[in-house]
Amino acid sequence: MSERNQRKVYQGRVVSDKMDKTITVVVETYKKHSLYGKRVKYSKKFKAHDENNQAKIGDIVKIMETRPLSATKRFRLVEVVEEAVII
């Protein structure tokens, strides 16, 4: 297996695009509670590199793990899966 295929890929929603070439993506996951068995939702925010500033707030995007690009950026934008509907 090649090294690129072992990188983590997440799908999440853009919650901030105010920074230049950087977006904040919230990724929601569900885990089962060990004792009670109920599904519990967890969310985590990641900063991702957006070279062309193409992602906007509310978009569903796919991000991939990469080398550290700054103090907090460890992901890069792969694609915009679904664009947000602006009303």
Curated annotation (Swiss-Prot):
The lineage of its organism: Bacteria, Bacillati, Bacillota, Bacilli, Bacillales. The keyword Signal does not apply. SUPFAM superfamilies: Nucleic acid-binding proteins. GO terms for molecular function: rRNA binding; structural constituent of ribosome. PROSITE patterns: RIBOSOMAL_S17 (PS00056). It comes from the Bacteria. Part of the 30S ribosomal subunit. Keywords: Ribonucleoprotein, Ribosomal protein, RNA-binding, rRNA-binding. The keyword RNA-binding applies. The gene is rpsQ. It comes from Bacillus licheniformis (strain ATCC 14580 / DSM 13 / JCM 2505 / CCUG 7422 / NBRC 12200 / NCIMB 9375 / NCTC 10341 / NRRL NRS-1264 / Gibson 46). Pfam families: Ribosomal_S17. This is Small ribosomal subunit protein uS17.
